[in-house]
UniProtKB/Swiss-Prot annotation:
GO terms for biological process: chromosome condensation. InterPro entries: Alba-like_dom_sf, DNA/RNA-bd_Alba, DNA/RNA-bd_Alba-like. The keyword Hydrolase does not apply. This is DNA/RNA-binding protein Alba. Keywords: Acetylation, Chromosome, Cytoplasm, DNA condensation, DNA-binding.
């Protein structure tokens, strides 16, 4: 699981650097995000593909839904994405 980058609230370039670092030692990197961070995950994948490593491939994209309990105790659905980049 060391080749997984979880996308959160930091700036996009932080995650781009994290993915590039993972790609130096792994042939595949998994970018994961939930909820509002999904667009940032797509931005990270596209920046790497278009600006840094032109020949990298998007091996797989999975979308789904997680059930999460909010502070009120109710279950809410949160969208998820998993993007697999491969050399």
């Amino acid at each position: 699981m060391d080749n997984v980058v979880l996308i959160g609230k930091k700036p996009v370039m932080n995650y781009v650097v994290a993915v590039l670092t993972q790609l130096t030692s792994n042939d595949e990197v998994i970018i994961k995000a939930r909820g509002k961070a999904i667009n940032k995950a797509v931005d990270v994948a596209e920046m790497i593909r278009n600006r840094f490593i032109k020949d990298i491939k998007i091996k797989k994209i999975e979308i789904g839904t997680d059930k999460v309990k909010n502070p009120d105790g109710r279950e809410v659905n949160v969208s998820t994405i998993e993007i697999v980049l491969a050399k």
